[in-house]
């Protein structure tokens, strides 16, 4: 698959923002719920440098793009540190962890609303949405860059924000020990089951590398389709 360098830069930019939003939200929520650990480490910021992970923000996205030719790069930041005993309520850590993927889902909703506003208020925005969608989904098309309206880069960034935030929301909710889904499951399972889950984490990771992409696509595809239909019909 041929790669458009400008599109890749847009995707990586949106991915880094989505990861920073996820980590900053978890850090802020943990602090509000009683655990200042992440705040004291400067993690309640959208500054990507505070959440940087070489593997999650550089190696994994580049592998996804250039080796596996994924539709979108995906990644993660440094794990947000939380100290369970600092939470005054038993479900404090659970809610703090859940806030990350929920923030990404809400970001996708906000991007959709922004696109709808631009669609109905800015000249040529509506006519450009088909091109935006085709480029974002890597559909081969011929585009006359000189004929595109000035608002086009904003439209593309917003549409990619929908895609990226939905993708990372689904990805983060996978039941793997190093992701939010795994951290949430540990809180739900009985003690012995949670210990067994952590003990066999290596096998879960192996399973992810084998079928993780398929599992993500099962949820991500229909979610993106719903947002795309809403964008076209409203």
Predicted feature locations:
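Hydrophobic transmembrane alpha-helices and their immediate loop junctions
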Residues: 1-234
């Amino acid at each position: 698959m041929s790669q458009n360098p400008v599109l890749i830069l847009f995707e990586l930019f949106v991915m880094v923002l989505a990861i920073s939003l996820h980590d900053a939200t978890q850090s802020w929520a943990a602090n509000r719920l009683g655990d200042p650990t992440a705040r004291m480490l400067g993690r309640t910021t959208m500054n990507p440098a505070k959440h940087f992970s070489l593997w999650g923000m550089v190696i994994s996205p580049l592998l996804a793009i250039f080796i596996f030719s994924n539709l979108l790069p995906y990644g993660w930041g440094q794990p947000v540190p939380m100290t369970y005993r600092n939470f005054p309520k038993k479900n404090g850590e659970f809610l703090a962890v859940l806030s990350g993927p929920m923030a990404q889902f809400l970001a996708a909703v906000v991007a959709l609303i922004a696109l709808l506003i631009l669609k109905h208020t800015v000249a040529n925005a509506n006519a450009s949405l088909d091109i935006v969608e085709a480029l974002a989904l890597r559909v081969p098309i011929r585009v006359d860059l000189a004929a595109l309206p000035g608002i086009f880069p904003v439209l593309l960034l917003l549409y990619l924000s929908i895609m990226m935030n939905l993708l990372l929301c689904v990805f983060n909710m996978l039941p793997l020990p190093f992701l939010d889904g795994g951290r949430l499951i540990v809180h739900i399972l009985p003690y012995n089951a949670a210990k067994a889950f952590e003990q066999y984490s290596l096998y879960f990771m192996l399973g992810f590398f084998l079928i993780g992409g398929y599992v993500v696509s099962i949820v991500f595809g229909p979610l993106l389709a719903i947002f795309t239909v809403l964008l076209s019909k409203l």
